[in-house]
Amino acid sequence: MILEIELNHSSLKKGQNVTEEEILMEISRLEREASYQSTINKVSKVALNSIYGVLGYHSFILYDREIARSVSEQSSHVIRYTILFFNRYFQQRFPNHRELHAKMGITKCDPIDFNAVNYADTDSVFIRYKDIMDKTDYKGTLEEFVFDIGENDLNDCVKDMLVGYIRKFNGFQQKIDGQRSMKLAFEMICHNVLWTSKKKYIKNISWEEGVYFKPLENVEVKGLDINKSSTPKFVRELLRETVHYILQHRELNLRDFIDHVKMQKSKFESANVEDVAISQRVNGYEKYVITAKDGVFEYVKGVTIQIRASSVYNAELTKSKYKHKYQQIRSGMKIQYYYSTDPRSDVFAFVNGDPCYEFLYPIDYSKQFEMLYLSPLNKIITSIGVQALPVSLIAFDPLW
């Protein structure tokens, strides 16, 4: 058998006379080598991350902030260089690229007087394509505008930029598997994106991996209370509805928005206690609770709110006639807790999913609403320039 293919890492050469068995053996060897190299890559990444962490730890014997910073300096420089590239491209090249304009059917393009990149993370940049398109008389959709620029000019410019960057630092242009060592892949298009802080955002996705979405059809949330498992599912849904409301209104009418929030509060105050109580796992109950009986509660300094709430529940259960119906709360158990209006304690808990209605303390719906819904909401709206809503503003008008 004459081998007709060329493999960069194979010991077999094109035109070499080999048997089928030799080819299968070589394939097996290359698969083992690929697996080994993949493991080495992962180990190296973990090692570098560990080195960065330990060298930046002030109690480490070889602590050195400058060396720690140098570990991540290259990746930091790459993202800064990428931001600079996109800003220059859209401010200098795109407005004056007549050939590109002709291909895209653009006859008018005003100067781009803002930075094209409005957010960058460790390995990604977000570009203001909608604002850029509005500077032109492009006739197509936003998605078509993005793809037209990429296919007709930008993709090649990005590739050349990365090749030049690697050459400047004398790096490898290809990885061991033959792929480019550095590439910038197009990920998604969004109708709009809302950031509250770094790595905390809401994306209203328009296109991703070849699939188009209508507004609000695919909303991705990262780092916010909507995604936290400790936030009750019912409350997460209320927050999700409000986020959709915000994404639908580019300019919020404060009066209408307050009416919407009041409606959400009405739903909240009509919910059962298990739907608005916070879920947490109890750790260190026996360590922090010294006394919890006969209305006397004594704790070790540093006790958490969920342990305090659990101790009140245990005390009430102990003196009730329902000791055989409900469990005592112990370390390791998952519980739900909430703020209470009862003068005996401002917090109360129960075993997760098993509310003890016979001796539940009354819930402080107003405080619970403020903590679970209003506080997370204010973090979102203040990030878009809307003043935080005080609790008093959401209070219902008296009926008499």
Predicted regions: what is each one?
Residues M1-A47, D64, S72-T122, Y129-W400:
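DNA-dependent DNA polymerase catalytic subunits
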Residues A47, I51-V54:
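Function-dense linear segments that define catalytic or interfacial modules
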Residues G56-S70:
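Gly-rich Lys/Arg/Thr-decorated short loops/hinges at beta-loop-alpha junctions or inter-strand turns
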